[in-house]
Each structure stands twice: as structure tokens, then as C-alpha cells.
From Swiss-Prot:
Belongs to the class-II aminoacyl-tRNA synthetase family. Phe-tRNA synthetase alpha subunit type 1 subfamily. Binds 2 magnesium ions per tetramer. The gene is pheS. Its cofactor is Mg(2+). Tetramer of two alpha and two beta subunits. GO terms for molecular function: ATP binding; magnesium ion binding; phenylalanine-tRNA ligase activity; tRNA binding. Gene3D superfamilies: Bira Bifunctional Protein, Domain 2. Its EC number is 6.1.1.20. This is Phenylalanine--tRNA ligase alpha subunit. GO terms for biological process: phenylalanyl-tRNA aminoacylation. It is found in: Cytoplasm. InterPro entries: aa-tRNA-synth_II (IPR006195), aa-tRNA-synth_II/BPL/LPL (IPR045864), Phe-tRNA-synth_IIc_asu (IPR004529), Phe-tRNA_ligase_II_N (IPR004188), Phe_tRNA_ligase_alpha1_bac (IPR022911), Phenylalanyl-tRNA_Synthase (IPR002319), tRNA-bd_arm (IPR010978).
Length: 356
């Protein structure tokens, strides 16, 4: 081998030995075997030689190219192995260290209450229905026999939104989930048996009221429905929810524009101790009544053929009563300590309906 080829071999091997990372290794590879590399330049010179000289010189250059290619590839593999070993050493896990304690989340008490309501009413044959949070004035008020002068329709109680472009129909953030009942009666044939849990909105904010809160309404439409069905349904629900088969339940006359007759539902309660089911006091928990004939007619149902009852309750209120939560605002303060205390385990399903 001529002196220049031996010099190229020694210099390349020395550069490879000095390379410690991919960048330095790649610089040696390109400088030797690349398009402008030193070995490539020697191959280009072969074209200017005589056939006899080209044969001898070409054989020597090709042997050198093969040798250097093997050396470069071998050094590249060594560098990759060293990089991998360094990364594995940095990521090494000490298996003798103690295991980190596991922590689990909790289901928000409002979510759990809605699950329990769905479970209890589901055992009675109800299904869950949903509807939009933004309702038309007609679905939220007019179809429910709410007169134009009713205080609930004022902007002090209701959040009004601009009408859709090209229409004059007013829109509101729904003040109740009753609009779901209207949409169900318009879209389905009786018999109907639904509950409609969801968010509702009213312009009110204090320790017991929130601008956004959750409500669950229910509706039953069928032939021959009477007050006895309403009382039996709600009594069974309240006793199952509060876990007291002997819970005192009282129905007293009231007024709602969409039901006739209308009734408030109270449960036995001790004002002194706050115990549900104990004492001589009564605590109002929900409203109910027989669906007003005008509401049935507004939804295309003949009141002489179809009857029904409806009810509505605040989900936060029932949750506060059962868990002894004093302030409604704490539901939305995102306090992890509070949630750990009042939240439910995600591994514990809502099976209260088994007590019915």
C-alpha cells in the first residue's frame, strides 16, 4: 500500500478513536466516505490513470474503502451502545425503594347524587332524558302555562340571551329542566316516564343559592294517572334516598302554573339536631303536582285521555341535607380536601335502588 493510502488509514482510525458522540463520528464518516470525502477523491483520480496503473491503484483504494467502512460502522455501533448504556444508567430504578402511596380521585357529591337518583327512579321504570341548556322562551315558560306577568320571567330572575339571527324568538338559560319534559311530550308517544337531571340557571347567589345549580325533574304521562301514583312514587324515592323506610313524608297544597293541583313535599326533620326523619318539624324538599291540562294540550295531548304528574327537586339541596353540608358555594370552590371528605369512591357504584 502506498504511503498516501496508509496515511489516510492511520488518520481515519485515529479520528474514529477520538470520536465520542454521534456528531463527531458522523463528521469522520462524511469526511472519509462522503461525496467530498478524501477516499472519494482518490477514486475520482483513477479515471486519469493508464489502464495498468488504474488496475493496481484501484485494487488498493477499494481494499482501503472496504476496511475503513467496516471500521467506521464498528465504531458507530460502539458509540450507540455507549449512549444507550448511559441512558439506561441514568434511568435506572432502584427496586429497593419503597413504593409510592397510591392516591385515587373521588366522585363529586353532586355527580353521585344524580347517579343515585337515576338508580332509584330507574328501578321504578323511569329513563333519563336530556335537553339543551339554552332554551326558547316558549319551551321554558309559555308551554308550561307560565303567564307573561309571572315574576320568574323577569330579568331579575332569568338570564336572557339575544334571539337567533333572523328570528324574534327569545332565548334563555333554562331556569328549570321542565323544557326537557315539553320536548319529550312533543317528540314521543305516551306512555312516558322520565327524569331530567341537569344544570339550570337563575340570577341568584348566596349561601343557599347559586347562579348555576342542578335540578332533577320527573314526568309520568299515561292513562288513569292519579295523585295516588304521585304520592307513592315520591314517598318511595325519598325513603330510599335518605335510607329510612319509615321517613315521614307530607304533601301540602301549593301553586305552580304547570300543575293542578300542586303540592309541596315535606319530610320529617328535627330543627334542633338537623336529623332527617327525627323530631316534630317538617322540611320542604321538592315540588310536585298533576300536569296541568293546558300543558298537555300545548304538547298535542288530549287531557281527557292522558293524565300525568310531574315533580322537581334541587340536587344540591338534597345532597346538602343528606351529607350535612352547610353552604351551597362549597360545591364549586374546588377544594380537594372538601372533595376527599364528601366525595364518593369511584369503585363504589350507586346501588341505593336495591333498598326499594
Amino acid at each position: 500500500m502506498s504511503d498516501d493510502l496508509e496515511t489516510l488509514r492511520q488518520e481515519t482510525l485515529a479520528a474514529l478513536a477520538a470520536a465520542t458522540d454521534r456528531r463527531e463520528w458522523d463528521a469522520v464518516r462524511v469526511g472519509t466516505l462522503g461525496k467530498s470525502g478524501r477516499l472519494t477523491a482518490l477514486l475520482k483520480e483513477l479515471g486519469r490513470m493508464t489502464p495498468e496503473a488504474r488496475k493496481l491503484r484501484g485494487a488498493a483504494v477499494n481494499r482501503l474503502r472496504d476496511d475503513l467502512t467496516r471500521e467506521i460502522e464498528a465504531r458507530g455501533a460502539e458509540i450507540e451502545s455507549a449512549i444507550l448504556n448511559a441512558r439506561l444508567a441514568a434511568e435506572r430504578v432502584d427496586v429497593t425503594l419503597p413504593v409510592r402511596p397510591e392516591s385515587s380521585g373521588a366522585i363529586h357529591p353532586i355527580s353521585r347524587t344524580m347517579e343515585e337518583m337515576a338508580a332509584i327512579f330507574g328501578a321504578m321504570g323511569f329513563k333519563v332524558a336530556e335537553g339543551p341548556d339554552i332554551e326558547t322562551d316558549w319551551h321554558n315558560f309559555s308551554a308550561l302555562n307560565t303567564p307573561d306577568h309571572h315574576p320568574a320571567r323577569t330579568d331579575q330572575d332569568t338570564f336572557y340571551l339575544p334571539a337567533r339571527e333572523g328570528t324574534s324568538q327569545e332565548r334563555v338559560l333554562r331556569t328549570q329542566t321542565s323544557g326537557v319534559q315539553i320536548r319529550t311530550m312533543l317528540g314521543e308517544e305516551p306512555p312516558i316516564r322520565i327524569i331530567a337531571p341537569g344544570r339550570t340557571y337563575r340570577a341568584d347567589h348566596d349561601a343557599t343559592h347559586s347562579p348555576m345549580f342542578h335540578q332533577c325533574e320527573g314526568l309520568v304521562i299515561d292513562r288513569g294517572i292519579t295523585l295516588a301514583h304521585l304520592k307513592g312514587c315520591l314517598t318511595d324515592f325519598l325513603r330510599a334516598y335518605f335510607g329510612n323506610p319509615d321517613l315521614p313524608v307530607r304533601f301540602r297544597a301549593s301553586y305552580f302554573p304547570f300543575t293542578e293541583p300542586s303540592m309541596e313535599v315535606d319530610i320529617g326533620w328535627s330543627r334542633k339536631s338537623g336529623e332527617i326523619g327525627g323530631g316534630d318539624d317538617w322540611l320542604e324538599v321538592l315540588g310536585s303536582g298533576m300536569v296541568h291540562p293546558r300543558v298537555l294540550a300545548n304538547c298535542g295531548l288530549d287531557p281527557r285521555e292522558w293524565q300525568g304528574f310531574a315533580f322537581g327537586m334541587g340536587i344540591e339541596r338534597l345532597t346538602m341535607l343528606r351529607h350535612g353540608i352547610p353552604d351551597l358555594r362549597s360545591f364549586y370552590e374546588s377544594d380537594v380536601r372538601w372533595l376527599r371528605h364528601y366525595g364518593a369512591s369511584p369503585l363504589s357504584p350507586a346501588l341505593l335502588h336495591e333498598g326499594l
